[in-house]
Amino acid sequence: MTIQSKISSCRNIMSEVQSNKSKVDAGSERAKANNTFFDVYNSFLLPTLTAYTIVKQNTEYTFPQEAVNKLKECLDYVTKTLDSKQVLNVSTFRVNSVYARDKISEAWVAHANEITREILDDLGVFKLVSDNKLEIVRLSTAIKGISTWPVTKKQFDDCTLALEVARNLLKTMKFDSEIETFLRKVRDKQATLQDLSDPIIKWIRDNNFEGSIQLSIKT
């Protein structure tokens, strides 16, 4: 059974079981173990399963096998627990669920940061000369939204739309290499008077950017 099938089966069974858990005496040791089991599932495992599924549905990203194996281990534990109707070693289930969440979230955030780094970098440059800086901020925020965990379907949808708009905007950004290098220095607060070559000065004046460009004065 694939992990996607395991996730679907597990969530369906858990939904049914949770609706009946109140039938167990609330004060019993069994109830305490059950409550801990459900708390761990709802707080740690379910958000991970949901976000994992969303990522797989919206990207071709492959999570590290170690993290996937730990997630499978948690799913197998849930299935076994529900089949046996007895909660055992719930503390281990908690540790494994937290571990799976941490490893999967760490891997995804690192990947999302990497695949959005270049366009966010370009938007940072474009913002320096844009007439609509708030729009650039909005687009950047939407794109950064997928670099979170647990990531949601809405964040993916917002990011996809923002990427399309951003790419179209960036097509209008036509600078030669000297100007682009200069703007990146300005963005990083590393531009100095020495960077003001004659072509750069002419470009600034021709575009009325005198009030937009800030330089660093190094002593």
Over which residues does each language-model region extend?
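Amphipathic alpha-helical assembly segments used for oligomerization, scaffolding, or translocation
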Residues: 1-196, 209-210
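C-terminal edge-of-domain segments
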Residues: 214-219
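Low-complexity, intrinsically disordered Gly/Pro/Thr-rich segments
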Residues: 196-204
